[in-house]
Amino acid sequence: MIKYSLILLAVLLIIFWIFTSYLLKRGEAPVADGSTNYAIVLGAKVNKGSVPSRALKYRLDAAYDYAMKYPHTQLILSGGQGDDEDATESSVMKKYLMDRGVSEFQLIEENESTSTFTNIKYSMKSIPLTEKKVTIISNDFHLARAQMIADYFHLEADVVAAPTPKIIEFKVRVRERFGLIAQKIVLWFK
C-alpha cells in the first residue's frame, strides 16, 4: 500500500511539474509589440543603499529597451517599500531609468504596492478607464501569474520577458509554481 501511495505521489508531482511548466512558458506570450500606451514594470527587491537587486535590474534593462523602442509608451513603475528596503521600489526604478536617459515624462510612479496583485491593482489608477490593453514587464518566471492577475482585472496583457538571474532561477521557478496555484485559488474566492 505504501509503495502504491509513493507511486501515486510521484505521478501527481510529475503532472504538477509538467502543468506548471506549461503555464510558466505560456506566460511569456504574447510578446509586446508597442501597441499599448502603458507598460507596468513590476517591482522587485531593492538592496541596501537603494540599489536594484539583479532581478529588478534585469526588469529595468528590459523596460529601458522597450521605452527606447516605443517612446509613446508610459512606463508605470510599480512597487512600494518593503520593511528591509531603504526606498520605494518605484523611486529606485525611476532613478535607474532616468540615469540611463529615459525621460521623466515617460515615467509614472506607483509606490504603494507590496505584491504582484497590488502592483497591478494600484497601477490601474494611472491607466484611463478606456484603456483595456497593457504591457507587463517582469522576469520571465513571473509573467504567468502577472497575466493571471491582469485578466482578473479585465486587462488584456502582452509582455516583455526579462531574463531571470541564474543564481536565483531554480528557487524562484519552484516557488512560482506554487504561487501560480495559490494565486488562482485566491482569485477564485475574491
Feature locations, PLM:
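N-terminal membrane-anchoring alpha-helices
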Residues: 1-35, 186
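A structural signal for short, hydrophobic/glycine-enriched beta-strand patches
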Residues: 21-174
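A transmembrane-helix-recognition feature enriched in membrane-embedded lipid enzymes
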Residues: 170-189
